[in-house]
Amino acid sequence: MNFTTAWALHPQLARDTVPLGDLALSRVLIIKDANYPWLLLVPRRPDITEIIDLDGVEQAQLMVEIDRTARALKTVTECDKLNIAALGNAVPQLHVHIIARRKTDEAWPKPVWGAVPPLAHDAAALDQFMNVMRAKLWVS
């Protein structure tokens, strides 16, 4: 791994998300699409595109953070299903999607990508969601 390069969030992820906070390894972000409660975990390591690019300790930490975040999101949203994926086809920087799905959402049962146009968050609802998620995740 190359730790000489400073970590920076990919510009596309910066445009498409709202920061929630940091866990030990990952930055937690909220996708700007109110159609779904949709979080991203982005390990704060430079030049990482795959989970296998992380060392074993970091891989284990990422799995702990995925578990922690997914459990918190499921509890907060009472969703029917969680979709968890690290795709990276459009944005090469390693990021893990954790999406709360409901059988009543517009895309169900298909994938969320491109199913419906993104819906802007209501500011008050987003603030409330952020506060509840922070409390569940103990994010600083």
Predicted regions located by residue number:
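HIT superfamily nucleotide-processing domains
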Residues: 1-140
